[in-house]
């Protein structure tokens, strides 16, 4: 009851007519797909080894979105919960030692990172960040938080180690309520330390209103920043 309508994935068990048998089949099918993908990645890596080009090739494994397998009674993608918004990211660079990094990054960062690794000229106008320092220092912090968008529901996510803030809707027309209202379709706030599976929305809890207002202002500033780009005059 504490989740706004805009935050409910349209691919629910009810909408998808997913009884228990179908749910088990879907999960099994997903695991099978992952196993198949793993085998194909292995084929690519073996081919690189045989070609003699492994030591001069940068390999990046990632995806454009995650996937729900029944969490929150959601299926497929589209939501801004962790299961859907987080993606795998594995980078293999010749001469770099294996490591695990925990900094927040965005897919937007990959272009800047590859440009740096390939020693291409730096472009200051890019919004993505070079994450290659993590390859030498796994503790390196690229971003304090990540930003994600679900355009179909005008949803915005700001995610840091402590909080996941999700806002649906950006503003009302000026003729309504005398001006702008951010988050007109609802807001979600999750304590990722105490509630990592995102079960309890704290957005309407009086105690956390300073946190909500801080994120609303932060998101407003973020949207202004990212829209100040080469496309604005196109």
Q: Which stretches of residues belong to each language-model region?
A:
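Intrinsically disordered, low-complexity polar regions and short flexible loop motifs
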Residues: 195
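Short amphipathic alpha-helical coupling segments at ligand-binding clamshell hinges
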Residues: 211-215
């Amino acid at each position: 009851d504490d989740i706004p309508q805009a935050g409910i994935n349209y691919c629910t068990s009810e909408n998808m007519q997913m009884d228990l048998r179908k749910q088990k089949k879907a999960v099994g099918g997903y695991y099978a797909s992952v196993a198949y993908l793993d085998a194909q990645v292995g084929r690519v890596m073996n081919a690189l080894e045989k070609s003699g080009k492994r030591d001069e090739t940068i390999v990046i494994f990632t995806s454009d979105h995650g996937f729900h397998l029944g969490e929150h009674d959601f299926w497929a993608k589209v939501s801004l919960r962790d299961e859907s918004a987080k993606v795998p990211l594995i980078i293999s660079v010749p001469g770099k030692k294996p490591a695990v990094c925990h900094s927040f990054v965005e897919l937007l960062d990959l272009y800047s990172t590859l440009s740096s690794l390939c020693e291409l000229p730096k472009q200051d106008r890019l919004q993505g960040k070079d994450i290659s320092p993590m390859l030498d220092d796994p503790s390196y912090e690229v971003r304090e938080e990540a930003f994600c968008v679900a355009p179909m529901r005008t949803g915005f996510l700001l995610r840091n180690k402590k909080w996941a803030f999700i806002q649906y809707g950006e503003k009302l027309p000026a003729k309504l309520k005398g001006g702008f209202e951010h988050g007109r379709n609802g807001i979600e706030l999750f304590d990722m330390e105490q509630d990592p599976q995102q079960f309890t929305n704290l957005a309407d809890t009086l105690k956390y209103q300073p946190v909500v207002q801080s994120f609303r202002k932060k998101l407003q500033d973020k949207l202004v920043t990212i829209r100040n780009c080469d496309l604005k005059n196109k």
